[in-house]
Amino acid sequence: MKLLPSVVLKLLLAAVLSALVTGESLEQLRRGLAAGTSNPDPSTGSTDQLLRLGGGRDRKVRDLQEADLDLLRVTLSSKPQALATPSKEEHGKRKKKGKGLGKKRDPCLRKYKDFCIHGECKYVKELRAPSCICHPGYHGERCHGLSLPVENRLYTYDHTTILAVVAVVLSSVCLLVIVGLLMFRYHRRGGYDVENEEKVKLGMTNSH
C-alpha cells in the first residue's frame, strides 16, 4: 500500500514531461514551417522551374504536331493526284519487270560463248543444245577441223596439157617469125649485092 502513492507520482511526472516535450516539438515544427514559407528552399524553386520548362516544351511539341497536321490536310486537299501517280508508276514498273521475265536470254551469248572455234553459235531449243555454223574451210561439231581442198586429177591433167599446147604454139610462132625475118633480110641483102655487081660491071665497061 505504501508503494502506490510513489508509483502514481512517477506516472504523473512522466506525463508532465511528455507533455512538455511534445509541446516543444510542436513549436519547433511550426517555426520551421513559417521559415520555409518566408524563405523557400532553392531546390524546390529549381524543381518548379523544371516543371515550367517541361510544360512549355510540351506545348511547343503540341503546336508543331498541330501545324504538321494542318500542312498534311492542305496538301491532301490541294493535290489529290500527286499521291495517285506513284501507284501508276509502280504499276508500270511491275509490268515492265513482268515482260522482262518472259524473255529468255540466248545461251550462246554467255554459257556457250566460246563453243564454236571457227564459226557462229546457234542454240537449238528443241534439242536444248548448241550447234555451230562453220566458216568456209572448217568442219566438225565445234568447227575445229580444217578441210583441205581435194584436187581433181582429170582437171589438173587437162589444165597442164592445155598449158603445154599453148606454150608449144607460142614457141613455134616465135620461131616462124624469126625465120621469116632472117629470110627476108637474106633476100634483101642478096638483091643489094647483085645491084652492086651490075654497077661495078657497068663502070668497068665505061672505062674501056
Curated annotation (Swiss-Prot):
Residues 20-160 are extracellular. GO terms for molecular function: epidermal growth factor receptor binding; growth factor activity; heparin binding. Residues 136-148 are annotated as: Toxin-binding domain. Residues 185-208 are cytoplasmic. O-glycosylated. Glycans are attached at residues 75, 85. Residues 36-49 have a biased composition (Polar residues). Residues 1-19 form the signal peptide. The record marks 141 as: Plays a critical role in diphtheria toxin binding and toxin sensitivity. The chain crosses the membrane at residues 161-184. One of its GO terms (cellular component) is plasma membrane. Residues 20-62, 149-208 form a propeptide. Disulfide bonds join 108-121, 116-132, 134-143. Residues 104-144 form the EGF-like domain. Residues 34-55, 81-104 are annotated as: Disordered. Residues 93-102 have a biased composition (Basic residues). Keywords: Cell membrane, Disulfide bond, EGF-like domain, Glycoprotein, Growth factor, Heparin-binding, Membrane, Receptor, Secreted, Signal, Transmembrane, Transmembrane helix. This is Proheparin-binding EGF-like growth factor. InterPro entries: EGF-like_dom. One of its GO terms (biological process) is positive regulation of cell population proliferation. Interacts with EGFR and ERBB4. Interacts with FBLN1. It comes from Chlorocebus aethiops. Growth factor that mediates its effects via EGFR, ERBB2 and ERBB4. Required for normal cardiac valve formation and normal heart function. Promotes smooth muscle cell proliferation. May be involved in macrophage-mediated cellular proliferation. It is mitogenic for fibroblasts, but not endothelial cells. It is able to bind EGF receptor/EGFR with higher affinity than EGF itself and is a far more potent mitogen for smooth muscle cells than EGF. Also acts as a diphtheria toxin receptor.
